[in-house]
């Protein structure tokens, strides 16, 4: 959906036609285990995603392939989905660990966007996390406070990854 205005239903006919071609082309490919037509449908130029568009594409996907799960939109904002996909770039290992310990222990998922995409017990899939950078002389990109050196980077990466593996 790169470059697509997913807040405007006028984009749906072309997008859906291309998406259905992809599904037909790749349906029998052995490496396809799940479909995901959208990624990070954040508010676009001050306009919210059109939930009906996301729902329509999800339902068309399920109509064509009812066997595989479908993630309606990876990252945000879920409307109708088989798997609750999460992007979490929290850099504080303890905060990150507490979030997913809570999910494992109580079934509650921390989501700062819960008002827009309520979690209703779907399987959770962490498709993006980390994003840690090492402080560099130039303007390196990453989330949160950069690691001061490789050792700090590796310690943080290990902590974030262990928090997921433990849950």
Spans of features found by a protein language model:
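Substrate-binding/catalytic cleft of secreted carbohydrate-active enzymes
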Residues: 1-167
């Amino acid at each position: 959906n790169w470059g697509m205005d997913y807040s405007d239903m006028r984009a749906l006919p072309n997008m859906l036609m291309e998406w259905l071609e992809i599904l037909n082309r790749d349906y029998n490919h052995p490496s396809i285990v799940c479909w995901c037509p959208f990624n990070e449908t954040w508010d676009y130029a001050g306009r919210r995603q059109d939930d009906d568009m996301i729902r329509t594409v999800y339902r068309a996907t399920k109509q064509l392939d009812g066997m595989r799960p479908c993630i309606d939109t990876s990252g945000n904002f879920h409307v109708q989905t088989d798997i609750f996909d999460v992007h979490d770039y929290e850099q504080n290992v303890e905060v990150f660990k507490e979030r997913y310990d809570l999910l494992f222990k109580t079934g509650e998922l921390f989501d700062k966007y819960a008002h827009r995409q309520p979690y209703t017990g779907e399987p959770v899939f962490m498709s993006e996390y980390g994003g840690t950078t090492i402080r560099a002389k130039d303007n390196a990109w990453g989330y949160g406070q950069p690691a001061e050196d490789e050792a700090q980077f590796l310690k943080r990466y290990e902590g974030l990854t262990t928090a997921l593996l433990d849950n």
